Amino acid sequence: MIENLGVGIDIIEVSRFRRKKYEENRNFYKKIFVKSELDYCLKFKNSAERFAGKFAIKEAVKKSISEKIRFLDIETSHLKSKPIVRIKKSREKYNFIASLSHENDFAVAVVISEKIK
């Protein structure tokens, strides 16, 4: 058994974010996404797809590690079209590999975490 590795997966309907418009639900979004994520997603006409993808990554991260962590302590970004994950305020240190895909009305994310000893 490999104790320092974890895997998380999450799938979400993009329409959940389409129905919950940012302009009308700012407090909801600010409880989940840090400023850099909000700024990134809101640049796009179809921001719901971006928000759903980032949410799926955050859920997958939470499932891949053993400690409880808040959404705002997980920050996602992109480098050359690949998701990057950073955690703030964690008892442990981790490396992450994340993958994200969108298809029709779904976003799915898979995250592999490695606890650094």
Show where each model-derived region lies.
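Core catalytic alpha/beta fold that binds nucleotide/phospho-ligands
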Residues: 1-117
